[in-house]
Amino acid sequence: TSAVCVTGLIAIDTADHFTFFGQAVVAALIQIGGLGVTSVGVGLILAAGKRVSIKGRMLVKEALNVDSFKGMVRLVKSVLLMTLCFEGAGVVLSFLVFSQDYPPLHALWISVFHSIAAFNNSGFDILGGLRNLIPYRSSILLNLTTCGLIIFGGLGFLVILDISRNRRFRKLTLHSKVVLSTTAALLLIGTLLLKATEDVTW
């Protein structure tokens, strides 16, 4: 439940108590929870070469909160491709860091899991010992990669698609403007509060 709902609440450490298969299941549940069951289902239908029914299009319309059926299948394809691109970039950048401490295959799996977890804002990790990313707190590359995945994943697919189509802020939809403004404000306020209340050196 925690994985699908991407709440990050766990009673046991994922790395210490789950096998590779168990970790893969958790990663899959996180991905499904982040994308949405409907988007994943439509993606599987498209991968099988079948047509999406009217009922399926209605479900996607409600799940993605769009106003029209026009371009619905293209929208789902864009969502899936966007997810693959962001998480793929996260895997490559994370691997550059994890490969310094783990064997290549293990580092690759950690990178894949970490990118899925970060982009979907799930809070899970497979580093063991409930350490999360504490051992890598001084790694600028990994921290920037993780923050980037979390922020872009939090913005949402529709906002990112809107930005890709309308490069100027004033041309964006009201929804995108509100999301971007709120995100920027929360990041700024959170940063200033941490600086003011915590013993940090930056």
Task: Walk through the language-model features, giving the residues of each.
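Membrane-proximal intracellular helices of multi-pass ion channels
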Residues: 1-202
